[in-house]
Amino acid sequence: EKMIVGVLSQSEKYAIDNKGTLVSSGGTAGYCIVCVPPEKKYSIYYIQAILGSVQGEWLASLYGEIFRGGYIARGTKVLKQIPIRCIDFENQDDIAKHDDIVRRQKKLIAIGDKLAQVRNNPRKAAPLKRIFEALKIEQQNAINGLYGMSSDEQRQIPLIKEIYAAN
């Protein structure tokens, strides 16, 4: 598995590829690839969750180039600078935090896939959207805890899409 990162995007754009997709990359457009070396115990879903969190997006905006309309270039140069919380795989509490984030991230993806299938049916989409949004908040709270932040502290981080949104 690998993560395909949309280099120039307005919000988190970190897709997991488990189909072996061929990707072209380079510069401030296109895509870049993130892989976890086989000898590492990290899940690519853990990395995806951290990068897509409020903290990850904020750091991408600080390190990346910001373009008109709220587009942020988040290529390999930027991604290398974003600190991913290390997990001590000898510590059961750390392992549990990692696995909890991974489980929730996979569930978010599954619900997102279901939402895409029913997007033209508001009656079916509405409950899925509520579940998805509640799960996103739960995931963000878990990531806050991982970094030792309260929800109040996390809310002090400006949302990039609001700061750089095109009107």
What are these regions (language model features)?
Residues 1-96:
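Polybasic, glycine- and aromatic-enriched phosphate-binding surface used to engage nucleic acids
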Residues 85-167:
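Non-catalytic DNA-recognition/assembly elements of restriction-modification systems
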